[in-house]
UniProtKB/Swiss-Prot annotation:
Belongs to the UPF0178 family. This is UPF0178 protein YaiI. InterPro entries: UPF0178. Pfam families: DUF188. It comes from the Bacteria.
Length: 152
């Protein structure tokens, strides 16, 4: 079981939460990015650098993730592919993507892309709040408890 991070767009504060969690859980944490990343020394934490390019990191995460893994991403298509493989998916704001919600999220994403393509300014997400950080940490802990229960 591994935690995969779409690290190019993942906020540093979320990475810090993940570093501490990987140590506490003794769970492999892999940060996938198209640039060099500095991570704390740990036998549980590693980086995987991929070539620059559209969806290269996403495709590598999909290729390597397995059922039971956790994927951290704000990229909805990546989350959908991870869920199809049986992995769990969580965004940096603490929202857990599920098979029941991912289709709706994909539809909304496509709708917003259509609006932007037609010239309508849709704006971006708000900056990450303390509440978002707490929600992320709580949802990560919830996932970990589910993992422990499934192991018996």
């Amino acid at each position: 079981m591994t935690i995969w991070v779409d690290a190019d767009a993942c906020p540093n504060v979320i990475k810090e939460i993940l570093y501490r969690a990987a140590e506490r859980m003794q769970m492999p944490l892999v940060l996938v990015a198209n640039q060099s990343l500095r991570v704390p020394p740990s036998r549980f934490i590693r980086t995987l650098r991929v070539a620059a390019g559209f969806d290269v990191a996403d495709n590598e995460i999909v290729r390597q993730c397995e059922a039971g893994d956790l994927v951290i991403t704000a990229d909805i298509p990546l989350a959908a592919e991870a869920i199809e493989k049986g992995a769990a998916a969580l965004n940096p704001r603490g929202e857990r993507y599920t098979p029941a919600t991912i289709r709706e999220r994909l539809t909304m994403r496509d709708f917003m892309d259509t609006l932007r393509a037609s010239g309508i300014q849709t704006g971006g997400p708000d900056s990450l709040s303390q509440r978002d950080r707490q929600a992320f940490a709580a949802e990560l802990e919830k996932w970990w408890l589910e993992v422990q229960r499934s192991r018996g």
